[in-house]
Amino acid sequence: MLPSSMPATGRLLPTQQADGHTQMALDAWLLKRSNGPVLRFYRWDGPWLSLGRHQRHWPEHWNELVRRGRLSLVRRPSGGRAVLHAGGLTYALICPDAPRRRQEAYRQACQWLIDGFQDLGLPLHFGSDPAGGEANNCFASATVADLVDPCGVKRVGSAQRWQNGRLLQHGEILLDPPAALWEEVFEEAAPAAAPAQINRLELDQRLRQSLVQSWSHCPWQMQPLKADEVQELEVELASGSAL
């Protein structure tokens, strides 16, 4: 549950499909502009590899894959390591006044996911691997920021960004990772797909409902972007100042 000081109304945005630059710019813009909690789900136009905000080094062959048109590269406003966005579902959750302790912040920001997947018949638990490590791949380990399924597969990887007392939590829900591309990028076998019982077409709606139920003290409203918000975002995208 979110802190009682949270503003009275939360904002739900419709699920969107767009290129990586637009998606990351929108999340950064929402973090700067939103005074209340926000949740949105989205998918990516084509395969994208997102780099963590502070990730400065990555394998040279990733650049070659970009040159060959196998994927596109973008930097996230959140931290963490590289995530391959293909065959999955991404979420962005913005929380004002979230707990400053990292583990507690992740716990509060992930419980609705645990509840939602439990209702779908897939129990998840927090990871226990130590933070850090040398792997470039976010899904190479599962820390207390991540959610793991009963088979030991990291099913949700999360990363955070704090700005002016607001928390942005990014999460990638691993559903159907592309085996060939995953091996090209990370030089290891792709994780197993999510169980067939997880309805890919309805997952965003079901998890959205889980958040509303879990944070029932806060009324939520579906509020698509307004025309002036779209215009402001386009200006920031054009200027390159969004992140």
Q: Positions of the model-derived regions?
A:
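Short acidic-glycine loop/turn motifs at beta-strand connectors
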Residues: 45, 149-152, 163-164, 177
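Internal, conserved structured core segments that host functional sites
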Residues: 87-144
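Aromatic/basic-lined ligand-recognition segments
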Residues: 142-148, 152-160
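Residues forming anionic-ligand binding surfaces in small-molecule and nucleic-acid pockets
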Residues: 77-96, 184-194
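Long, positively charged amphipathic alpha-helical accessory segments at protein N-termini or as interdomain linkers
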Residues: 100, 111-131, 161-243
